[in-house]
């Protein structure tokens, strides 16, 4: 009887802990969803994303905890009013976490994507030639390719958009960087646009690719449609950036 009571107590404790963790995850996701609730001078107020980060850190379930932190670090660094040094710290925290957790969850497309996205954001803060010489651009390319292989549709074709944008915008640097290709940009960005035409960045990059590859009539048509759209509430800042 005593053994049964102890077992029952342990079971109740285990269930309670799981319910608490699940509750924290749901709260964290809600705060993340509301990350654009207050916009000030073109940036999101950090209150909701700070709460999201705090709550994601309390979650036990994986890989949800890691994915939540990675996307929250990226949002806070990219879309709230923080210094460049704080941006670099947030991106670096995400890169380190993703590198660690990608070994634990090697087949998780979301972790692979946020690893590439945070690394790309960090690289935007340093000189492109320096990033290329140090192999950073090649590493980001490899991470994006891995994310595409695992889940090309994740985050509205996020990895396709990222890698396609790199092929389109990263310059060829003699003896250092020779792989950027308009042909690859065309292939990747067309696919991203087809998968998620509602994402303003997909539309913008697709139209830009059309312009660069001399399909100006089609490019103009896509651009004209884009600027008539309204930013989506949950993606307000990124949509606004490309719609304007």
Residue ranges, per PLM feature:
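Bacterial N-terminal signal peptides that target proteins for export
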Residues: 1-8
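Short, charge-rich amphipathic alpha-helical segments embedded
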Residues: 57-72, 79, 108-110
């Amino acid at each position: 009887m005593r053994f049964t009571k102890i077992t029952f107590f342990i079971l109740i404790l285990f269930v309670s802990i799981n319910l608490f963790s699940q509750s924290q995850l749901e709260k964290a996701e809600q705060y993340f969803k509301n990350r654009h609730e207050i916009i000030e001078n073109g940036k999101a107020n950090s209150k909701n994303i700070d709460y999201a980060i705090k709550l994601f850190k309390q979650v036990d379930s994986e890989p949800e905890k890691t994915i939540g932190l990675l996307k929250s670090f990226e949002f806070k660094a990219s879309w709230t009013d923080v210094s460049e040094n704080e941006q670099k710290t947030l991106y670096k925290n995400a890169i380190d976490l993703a590198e660690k957790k990608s070994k634990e969850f090697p087949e998780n497309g979301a972790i692979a994507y946020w690893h590439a996205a945070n690394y790309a954001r960090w690289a935007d803060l340093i000189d492109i030639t320096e990033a290329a010489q140090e192999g950073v651009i090649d590493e980001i390319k490899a991470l994006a390719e891995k994310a595409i292989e695992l889940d090309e549709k994740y985050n509205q074709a996020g990895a396709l958009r990222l890698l396609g944008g790199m092929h389109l915008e990263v310059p060829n640097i003699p003896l250092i960087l020779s792989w950027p290709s308009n042909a690859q940009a065309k292939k990747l960005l067309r696919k991203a646009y087809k998968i998620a035409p509602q994402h303003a960045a997909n539309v913008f990059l697709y139209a830009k690719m059309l312009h660069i590859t001399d399909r100006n009539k089609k490019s103009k048509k896509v651009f004209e449609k884009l600027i008539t759209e309204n930013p989506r509430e949950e993606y307000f800042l990124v949509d606004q950036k490309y719609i304007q």
